[in-house]
């Protein structure tokens, strides 16, 4: 019997959200980080994110909702953009991303944002 090592893939969660105001936020599903790299990757590949309709994100620890990344404002599409964690993260803890329409958005148009985050 032959045994081959399996590649370790980091957890990736998709999102497809609509925000009608700057009130409230939405979470992705939780996932484990499968490597020791202290970065996460964000793709925003559809929606109407812009300089007037700003999408805000932050990574949180699922067990206590503690922030493990800085809040980041996004004004355009991104492809596997790399962001560092603000706290040390590990492979035995569940994490999720919380998103919202940023308070500094100047349009009342609903914000639509879709993509994926890799922990």
Which sequence ranges carry the predicted segments?
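N-terminal prepro-regions of secreted/extracellular proteins
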Residues: 1-33
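Exposed aromatic-hydrophobic patches
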Residues: 29-30, 78-88
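Short, surface-exposed loop/turn motifs at beta-strand boundaries within globular domains
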Residues: 33-37, 52, 90
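Noncatalytic modules at the cell exterior or secretory-pathway interfaces
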Residues: 39-42, 87-103
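Short solvent-exposed strand-capping/beta-turn motif centered on an Asx-Ser/Thr pair
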Residues: 45-49
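Short, surface-exposed beta-strand/strand-loop-strand elements in extracellular ectodomains
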Residues: 51-67
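Edge beta-strands of jelly-roll/beta-sandwich modules across compartments, strongly enriched
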Residues: 53-55, 104-119
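Solvent-exposed serine/threonine-rich low-complexity stretches and specific carbohydrate-binding patches
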Residues: 66-80
């Amino acid at each position: 019997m032959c045994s081959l090592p399996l590649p370790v893939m980091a957890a990736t969660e998709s999102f497809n959200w609509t925000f009608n105001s700057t009130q409230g936020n939405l979470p992705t599903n939780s996932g484990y980080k499968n490597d020791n790299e202290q970065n996460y990757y964000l793709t925003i590949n559809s929606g109407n994110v812009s300089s007037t309709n700003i999408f805000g994100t932050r990574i949180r620890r699922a067990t206590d909702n503690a922030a493990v990344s800085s809040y980041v404002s996004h004004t355009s599409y991104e492809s596997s953009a790399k962001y560092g964690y603000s706290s040390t993260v590990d492979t035995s803890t569940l994490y999720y991303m919380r998103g919202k329409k940023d308070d500094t958005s100047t349009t009342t148009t609903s914000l639509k944002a879709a993509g994926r985050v890799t922990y």
